[in-house]
């Protein structure tokens, strides 16, 4: 067996050749660039969700806050901020009127397109029922799709206690949005009540809403941007989500010996799912665990999800 020094000499000779016939080799790695992903938080609810994502240090995403309320934008942590409809609202908000939100987005369409430029995938997140998110989100989504960008809406519907008007406006906004995006993930806030304790303060309940929106975005974006045991690239995600229509989201956690299967069952039976997932045309799932997570556990979890 050759010594390590002889091995090194052999490698040098293999790649460099003799001193009299030395050649220079340039190795270009075959690396596919990661898709450029942008998240637009629209209105108050979208802006709050954006702040939650930023604090969670989600990697590989560009954050853009969009609002008619200049003061809310000032306090937002997104590096890019667009105050839409300055002539329409003078930076004072949409007053819970979706028509004003729509007009504001149309007024600022060129600025929005500049912010969208270069993206392969865009998430539009907002809370439906108010003025800016409900009115502006469909306009932004249409601009994005017209630019050839894979467009995903991740939105919430208001709590019942928020009143009839907001619920009605949310349903109208949902109808306007669903045909403007490739995939629409809808999360009814009332379903989130089942995830929290009855004594949870109102402010904390809305923080849970923000975090569910964060998980909806991160669960998909991590598939593309984070290196895992089994890698999924942007083309795989696009094949599932392009022109997919309505989508459902489930979240599950598990600990102990049966952690993977427990998490999978919890996700499949998640209260966030309004419908049974049987008959789904496609599915994306992201399994995250410690360094001791085994391939056997992943296989068991995948079987539960796909069967």
Predicted regions and their residues:
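Tubulin/FtsZ superfamily GTPase core signature
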Residues: 2-307
């Amino acid at each position: 067996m050759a010594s390590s020094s002889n091995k090194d000499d052999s490698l040098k000779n293999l790649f460099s050749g003799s001193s009299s016939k030395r050649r220079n080799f340039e190795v270009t790695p075959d690396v596919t660039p990661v898709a450029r992903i942008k998240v637009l938080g629209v209105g108050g609810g979208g802006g709050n969700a954006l702040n939650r994502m930023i604090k969670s240090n989600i990697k590989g995403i560009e954050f853009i806050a969009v609002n008619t309320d200049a003061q809310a934008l000032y306090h937002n942590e997104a590096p890019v901020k667009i105050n839409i409809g300055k002539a329409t609202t003078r930076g004072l908000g949409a007053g819970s009127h979706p028509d004003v939100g729509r007009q504001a987005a149309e007024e600022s369409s060129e600025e929005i397109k500049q912010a969208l430029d270069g993206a392969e995938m865009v998430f539009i997140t907002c809370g439906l029922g108010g003025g800016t998110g409900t009115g502006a989100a469909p306009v932004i989504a249409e601009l994005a799709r017209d630019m050839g960008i894979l467009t995903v809406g991740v939105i919430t519907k208001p709590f019942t206690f928020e009143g009839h008007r907001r619920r009605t406006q949310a349903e109208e906004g949902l109808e306007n949005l669903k045909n403007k995006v490739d995939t629409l993930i809808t999360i009814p806030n009332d379903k989130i009540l089942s995830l929290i304790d009855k004594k949870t303060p109102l402010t904390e309940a809305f923080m849970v809403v923000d975090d569910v929106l964060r998980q909806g975005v991160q669960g998909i974006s991590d598939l593309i941007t984070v290196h895992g045991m089994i890698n999924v690239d942007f083309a795989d995600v696009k094949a599932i989500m392009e022109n997919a229509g309505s989508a459902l989201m489930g979240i599950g956690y598990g600990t102990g010996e049966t952690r993977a299967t427990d998490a999978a069952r919890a996700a499949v039976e998640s209260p966030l799912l309004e419908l049974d997932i049987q008959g789904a045309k496609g599915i994306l799932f992201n399994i995250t665990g410690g360094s001791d997570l085994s391939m056997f556990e992943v296989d068991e979890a995948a079987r539960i999800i796909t069967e």
